[in-house]
């Protein structure tokens, strides 16, 4: 055990949080970050580079939409937003440079539910990782990794944190 070197890099309580959220999700490891927006940003930036492409459900949280539609394009990453009510829209939107498919377990704000297993099958057919925001679903209701997700993100400010009194985000793989 290396001990607590510098709190910004890691600390014992952060490590416990990461391990427990990863265990709840059925993942290998977790990374706690400052916010849900940071979790999504880190997940996308880890997978994409300038010239890459993302396919995303169009029924997603507004902040995530803004990240994908306005922020990432400034870095050369584009996104095609698809109507998730027709699952073949995901496959039709895939390009040679597509690096991720993104959905939410429960669409925010409409609470629509996407057939995650089917979207995962499409993603994996093309060897593309499926990133799932499980903020509203929580591992209490659904564990996306068990349904084919490769990366799960949370805004821990919502249900994981309890009452919105703390700010945080988590990435699980």
Residue ranges with predicted function:
Residues 1-23, 28:
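A glycine-/small-polar-enriched, mobile loop at the entrance of the PLP active site in fold-type I
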Residues 29-173:
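Conserved PLP-enzyme active-site core in the AAT-like
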């Amino acid at each position: 055990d290396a001990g607590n070197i510098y709190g910004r890099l890691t600390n014992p309580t952060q490590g416990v949080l990461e391990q427990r959220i990863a265990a709840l999700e059925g993942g290998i490891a977790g990374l706690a970050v400052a916010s849900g927006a940071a979790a999504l940003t880190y997940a996308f930036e880890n997978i994409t580079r300038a010239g890459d492409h993302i396919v995303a459900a169009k029924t997603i949280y507004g902040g995530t939409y803004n990240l994908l539609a306005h922020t990432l394009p400034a870095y050369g990453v584009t996104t095609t937003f698809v109507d998730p009510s027709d699952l073949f829209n995901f496959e039709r939107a895939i390009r040679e440079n597509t690096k991720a498919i993104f959905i939410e377990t429960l669409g925010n704000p409409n609470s629509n539910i996407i057939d995650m297993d089917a979207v995962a099958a499409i993603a994996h057919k093309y060897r593309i990782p499926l990133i799932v925001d499980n903020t509203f679903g929580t591992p209490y209701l659904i564990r996306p990794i068990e349904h084919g997700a490769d990366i799960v993100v949370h805004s821990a400010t919502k249900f994981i944190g309890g009452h919105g009194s703390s700010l945080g985000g988590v990435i699980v793989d």
